[in-house]
């Protein structure tokens, strides 16, 4: 099963994702391949749609995953099927799960000010201020160059 994971890792790396994202996506496929070898005792190309649906229900039930996480797993199974197994994918056979939209809680200006003031280092204060005021992600701020500003 390692050759499937290696092929997946190679194909997914072509998408230009961060190392953290690549690791997470590989974790979904590793879990799937482990399930196939230990529970179904099948190769990935021999798995039916019914067995894929059972696996998704098993993920939701046994690991208590959120619908968002299950959708991410389905998305990676789709990529794996299309680009590693070179088999067609039918969205009607394994639809994405619905989930409730929610608004994230945002700290008040006073809370952010207290947090930034508590930071001992000027560099940390500058990075936190930039993240808060611009909406950049941590990885984006860490990779900023002087020319970018």
What are the functions of these language-model segments?
Residues 1-149:
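Conserved catalytic core of the tyrosine transesterase superfamily
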């Amino acid at each position: 099963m390692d050759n499937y994971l290696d092929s997946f890792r190679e194909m997914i790396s072509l998408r230009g994702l961060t190392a953290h994202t690549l690791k997470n996506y590989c974790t979904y496929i590793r879990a799937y391949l482990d399930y196939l070898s230990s529970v179904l005792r099948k190769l990935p190309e021999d798995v039916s749609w019914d067995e894929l649906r059972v696996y998704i229900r098993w993920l939701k039930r046994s690991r208590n995953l959120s619908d968002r996480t299950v959708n991410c797993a389905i998305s990676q199974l789709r990529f794996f099927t299309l680009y590693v197994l070179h088999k067609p994918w039918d969205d009607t056979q394994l639809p994405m799960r619905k989930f409730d939209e929610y608004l994230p809680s945002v700290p008040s200006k006073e809370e952010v000010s207290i947090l930034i003031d508590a930071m001992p280092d000027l560099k940390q204060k500058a990075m936190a201020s930039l993240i808060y005021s611009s909406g950049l992600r941590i990885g984006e701020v860490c990779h900023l160059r002087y020319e970018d500003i």
